[in-house]
Amino acid sequence: MNDIILKSLSTLITEQRNPNSVDIDRQSTLEIVRLMNEEDKLVPLAIESCLPQISLAVEQIVQAFQQGGRLIYIGAGTSGRLGVLDASECPPTFGVSTEMVKGIIAGGECAIRHPVEGAEDNTKAVLNDLQSIHFSKNDVLVGIAASGRTPYVIAGLQYAKSLGALTISIASNPKSEMAEIADIAIETIVGPEILTGSSRLKSGTAQKMVLNMLTTASMILLGKCYENLMVDVQASNEKLKARAVRIVMQATDCNKTLAEQTLLEADQNAKLAIMMILSTLSKSEAKVLLERHQGKLRNALSK
């Protein structure tokens, strides 16, 4: 079995030695960080070639959201942690339920902070993980793995596929096993890492950028922003409360006093406060109009 894995790894771009960093252990501190920076410049170029697939994925995710589905990330190690990170940022940023976007990491909660031996090879665990959240055909599953061959992720994609759910893969190797399974394959080919096989570097950066696009673009299309303002932000701490005031002021060109007063009346709902100020409607009237337009502030204001 080890020989099979060894042979499989030897064909992966992410496992190749980077000729630019062969002498990295002899370089100065400045030379090391300069080389890392130069290599990181390849990441957005790799993502640029994936934009059609990313765009298609976003459109499908939005459709699933509109039909009551969820976005679920699965991954092991760095890939799993990035999924958990992106999912955890959605509720405070966009005011959505913690159930709408979820990240699942091989090995469970403990694996977020500590490595869990054998977790990425446990194909039965992912079935339990997905079944425990009642994953269904209405949901979208995004499998994340730089190698494109992680058993935990592959088994998860196969399970989701068997239910009829949309599957998306994110890998940094071309024509991966994951890509063969997924309905939409996003392949961020960033090349060999400066430390051979350390896919937490360029590959991890590429994954984070793609996840940023999937959730942010989806939420924009769902009406979670007005202009470029996060109007559904949850004012759960002092910084976010101040941000909500600024958002209302920027969207309406009103003064701080009016913004604070209207936010108080609108139960700290920035979107509703903006609607009330710009439309001069009462709280209840503004709320009804927003609901009529599925929470899309721009559409509601145009009527």
Swiss-Prot record:
It catalyses: N-acetyl-D-muramate 6-phosphate + H2O = N-acetyl-D-glucosamine 6-phosphate + (R)-lactate. InterPro entries: Etherase_MurQ, Glucokinase_regulatory_CS, MURQ/GCKR, SIS_dom, SIS_dom_sf. The keyword Iron-sulfur does not apply. One of its GO terms (molecular function) is ether hydrolase activity. Residues 61-224 form the SIS domain. SUPFAM superfamilies: SIS domain. The active site is at residues 89, 120. It comes from the Bacteria. It is an enzyme of class 4 (lyase). Keywords: Carbohydrate metabolism, Lyase. GO terms for biological process: 1,6-anhydro-N-acetyl-beta-muramic acid catabolic process; amino sugar catabolic process; N-acetylmuramic acid catabolic process; peptidoglycan turnover. The keyword Lyase applies. Specifically catalyzes the cleavage of the D-lactyl ether substituent of MurNAc 6-phosphate, producing GlcNAc 6-phosphate and D-lactate. Together with AnmK, is also required for the utilization of anhydro-N-acetylmuramic acid (anhMurNAc) either imported from the medium or derived from its own cell wall murein, and thus plays a role in cell wall recycling. A lyase-type mechanism (elimination/hydration) is suggested for the cleavage of the lactyl ether bond of MurNAc 6-phosphate, with the formation of an alpha,beta-unsaturated aldehyde intermediate with (E)-stereochemistry, followed by the syn addition of water to give product. PANTHER family: GLUCOKINASE REGULATORY PROTEIN (PTHR10088:SF4). Belongs to the GCKR-like family. MurNAc-6-P etherase subfamily. Homodimer. This is N-acetylmuramic acid 6-phosphate etherase. The gene is murQ.
